[in-house]
Amino acid sequence: MANQLTEEQIAEFKEAFSLFDKDGDGCITTQELGTVMRSLGQNPTEAELQDMVNEIDKDGNGTVDFPEFLTMMSRKMKDTDSEEEIREAFRVFDKDGNGFVSAAELRHVMTRLGEKLSDEEVDEMIQAADTDGDGQVNYEEFVHMLVSK
């Protein structure tokens, strides 16, 4: 299943995996998953985190390695994101709830994820998604950015 991904997709997933894998040991633990989810404003219980890891953890060692992560991500790409999941993701970025993601909000979320971006990189990300040129990303532009990836 993972072999249907492009090299670019695999590279993006590797980058995402490394955001979760805080200690760089090649495995995501429930603690690391919890840290990332809390940085995104979620508050999962220990049991919920364990369920998430167990769902992906094919070899039963209690952690998620990159091949397991890749399998999960390729499966998730097949089940196109539900409207509610996309709305929820948009709300994570739209901190002030005004219906737009500004450069400052994007930088804030990416920093909380451990991604230090320069102003230029943040501006490039906004420009790539900002089809009407108003300097911020509205919900429609956000959806378009997700589905055109």
From Swiss-Prot:
Annotated binding of Ca(2+) 1, by residue: D21, D23, D25, C27, E32
Disulfide bonds, paired cysteine numbers: none
Record Gene3D superfamilies: EF-hand
Membrane-spanning intervals of the chain: none
Keyword Nucleotidyltransferase: no
Entry keywords, A to Z: Calcium, Metal-binding, Repeat
Residues binding Ca(2+) 3, per UniProt: D94, D96, N98, E105
Binding site for Ca(2+) 2: D57, D59, N61, T63, E68
GO BP annotations, alphabetical order: establishment of localization in cell
Subunit-structure text: Interacts with MYO10, the interaction is calcium-dependent and essential for MYO10 function in filopodial extension.
Family: Belongs to the calmodulin family.
Record's protein name: Calmodulin-like protein 3
Organism name: Rattus norvegicus (Rat)
Higher taxonomy: Eukaryota, Metazoa, Chordata, Craniata, Vertebrata
Gene name tied to this protein: Calml3
